[in-house]
């Protein structure tokens, strides 16, 4: 009887040694916060979506703030004139303390003659 248990112990230790060299398979019964039976936990999914959307929201907010700053700059610089969003975004990037004339390539011309013949 004792011999049988000794042989079983040796066999068990040999199996354990062999199993160390084999890749470990994921135990489907183990639960963690991220998944249960291969389905992502809704709380974890919400976190993933929020992390993916957050940079987009921040970029949109930065763009909107830049446009508002540019419109304010246009209004002050050009005596109350309003700008479209694209021009306002360009003007927002100008140095507000630099009052030298800006290169013409930064201005948007809506005049068909200027656009057709390309004076600038």
Curated annotation (Swiss-Prot):
Molecular functions per Gene Ontology: peptidase activity
Transmembrane is among the record's keywords: no
Entry keyword Mitochondrion: no
Record's subcellular location: Host cytoplasm
EC number of this enzyme: 3.4.-.-
Compositional bias ranges of the Polar residues kind: 1-23
GO CC field: host cell cytoplasm
Highest taxon of the lineage: Viruses
Any one GO BP annotation for this protein: viral capsid assembly
Region annotation (Disordered) ranges: 1-64
Sites annotated Cleavage: 76-78, 93-94, 108-109
Root EC class: hydrolase
Pfam families to which the protein is assigned, alphabetical: Phage_B (PF02304)
Post-translational modification: The proteolytic cleavage of the internal scaffolding protein B releases the scaffold protein in order to continue virion assembly.
InterPro entries membership: Phage_B, Phage_B_sf
Job of this protein: Participates in the assembly of the viral procapsid in the cytoplasm. Forms first a 12S pre-assembly complex with protein H, and F and G pentamers, then twelve 12S complexes are joined by the D protein to form the procapsid. Internal scaffold protein B is released from the procapsid upon genome packaging. Autoproteolytic activity cleaves protein B and probably facilitates its removal through the pores of the procapsid.
Family to which this protein belongs: Belongs to the microviridae B protein family.
Name this polypeptide is given: Internal scaffolding protein B
Organism: Enterobacteria phage S13 (Bacteriophage S13)
Gene from which the chain derives: B
